[in-house]
Amino acid sequence: MISDNLMLNNDKTEFLIIGTRQQLAKVNINCIRVGSTDVCPVTVARNLGSWFDEQLNMSTHISKLCGVAFYHLHNIKRIRKYLSRESTEMLVHAFITSRLDYCNSLLYGLPNYQLNKLQRVLNASARLVCNAPTFCHISPLLRGLHWFPVKARIEFKILLITSKQFTDLLLNICAIY
């Protein structure tokens, strides 16, 4: 690596062993040596803004995402009385829904109890934008804002990525002929 002018950043280098609980119990790796550096395994690693854990159940990613989202919701709620509905919606899109939509295709197939945590964030965001009471029915608010539920947002993102790939493939084929 040194001959290629590459060096590891010791503070950021980590590795993750992925498997089921039973598989992880059988593995006993303390550290691996890369060049002159010992790299020890971690239970959670961050890559491109997503948190991955040993069992790939995304629980760490979801809990950190919910924590950050509720923090921003709290801050927006403090200044809500000074904002119009449109500005509140813009802030919610900038700070909350953009985070919910980032890498959400990784969440496809997770159990409902995991996705319900993200749905609570989306529901609280809709209530904040519409200035609705805490216990009002959420479906009309989401419909009025034209927001999909979390599970539908994930499926929509996957369909969008797939259709873009097919469109690009067709354009490349048409360019050949």
Q: What residue ranges belong to the model's regions?
A:
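Hydrophobic/basic alpha-helical segments
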Residues: 1-177
